[in-house]
């Protein structure tokens, strides 16, 4: 529970209540949602409490906590996992790791308030080496094979992406075992998507056991002749781990044509930030060998990729 200025204006403050829920995630299992409103010292009021707002649009962002003694900034950190499969993931030493620290800010759009959750600026000190890549106009695909080789699977990709107005433009990260994670803009659907169905080890998701409450929801939907919500809300659903998550591009500024993406890749996670954290998306991945290849690709038109950089990270 904390205060944030709206659009950086300290004369216009709002209170934010975060809530870690299990189940209830848009894609199944656990997640963090938030509510923005006013607090008089006793009562918290939120005028749009029925609108679900996710702090992160991936499936592995839970147990978010914020810190004291950070000046006038609000910094948070999350646990990267989901209780649907937290005890099934192929970790040997732990049950998941923390995500990168993030700075939370509040912005207003069309009369409603939303949190942007960008990586904290201190994280950039992890950059060790930078490769500046040439701008690319892509009509099909451009391979950057081995661009992240010798980075031990820990690197950051930055780019300004201008998709075709009705097409798909994406960045694929992969290894030489044909395992890949795809991040793409689907402009016709108005979504940014992260697909981990072929990211590496995924079959453990077949053993996932949803929460009893979620199973009750499934039963109710089945009686109506419908599939479980976690399946219909996901894209390319294979099992409770092998799927794609997505976020609406309406969270970004209206009329946007170019989107800034910042992708942090580690040995078992991919964290995506779009337009300064207006969209954040965190997902676990378990490739059997480190990702080291990048491919720019499009469908249904040409896309521009500019200011493209790959940073080796000291993680």
Language model features by range: what are they?
Residues 10, 38-51, 55-59, 63-315:
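Beta-rich accessory regions
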Residues 5-7:
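Outer-membrane beta-barrel proteins
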